[in-house]
Amino acid sequence: MKLSRRSFIKSSGLAIAGASIASPLFSFAKSKGILGIQLYSVREDMAKDPLGTLKQIAAIGYKNVEHANYKERKFYGYAPTEFKKILADMGMKMPSGHTVLGKQHWDEAKKDFTDAWKYTVEDAATAGQKYVVSPWLDESIYQTEDSLKAFMDVFNKCGELCKKSGMKFGYHNHHFEFAKKVNDKILYDLILDNTDKKLVVQQLDTGNLFNAGVKAIDIVKKYPGRFELMHVKDEVEAAAGAHEKYESAVLGKGIAQVKEVIDLGQSAGTKYFIVEQEAYQGMKPIDCAKEDFEAMKKWGY
């Protein structure tokens, strides 16, 4: 059964309370940015054989990975120091990772984060992360504009917490942020308007917002310089009966204007370009990861 990114985040994220490509064609080109892959792209392989899958990712040429699995103070079953060494031995790093910051991680009475969240930040720093990225907002958080603003203040405080460990805190969008309004204001606009850009960075997913009828190129133009990181994702129309109209596809084979979006982002200051593909149109996920890598290298990343 296909597990959607949204379902995965809800079930696992809320539970806590690239060597150059072998072809000489790309060997000497200067990269436009730091390229990596979100390991959710190969989630089933990582669940079955994390070490073997990481070796395949490294063999493709990826130098950076982004995790989507932090449970019981472990990344894919490995302690932070151990996972960092595993990656280093394969020539890779983990500059960012996805862990949901939820209401349960803020103690309103104490005006402080819970120990569970403090451990999350501590473990991220130990693993070598530069960014702790939260990829979800529970619906209860944006029931009213006041409730959203209150939690955006928690976001800002998390930025301060991460800063103490030499990291930054960030938020990653899906499509609901562009589809939903609060007080007749688009949710995504409220998120950006109520977070301090010095404390909370944005990781724009170039594909997710397609299901809200929004194009990433327009968001990059609207908020130049706000996206230190991007999830690089192409989109195609999903098969009839699918949960959403669009699904991700191999880069360059869809309709999301990916190259134009990331080039514009790069010119405005985007540093990290993280490939993520969640649907595969019959291909093996690891083969998609390879084709995505080749597309990014062809585009100069």
Q: Language-model segments: what does each one mean?
A:
Residues 2-130, 201, 225, 263, ...:
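N-terminal pre-domain/capping segments
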Residues 12-14, 20-24, 106-201, 286:
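Active-site acidic/histidine proton-transfer and metal-coordination neighborhood
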Residues 42-48, 68-79, 102-114, 139-143, ...:
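Acidic-and-aromatic substrate-binding clefts and catalytic sites of carbohydrate-active enzymes
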Residues 54, 80-84, 117-121, 152-159, ...:
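Generic structural signal for well-ordered alpha-helices
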Residues 64-65, 162-255:
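Acidic/histidine-rich catalytic cores of soluble enzymes
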Residues 92, 129, 167, 268-271:
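A short helix->loop->beta-strand "cap" motif at the edges of active sites that frequently abuts
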Residues 251-254, 259-262, 268, 272-276:
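H/E-rich (His + Asp/Glu) clusters that bind or coordinate divalent metals
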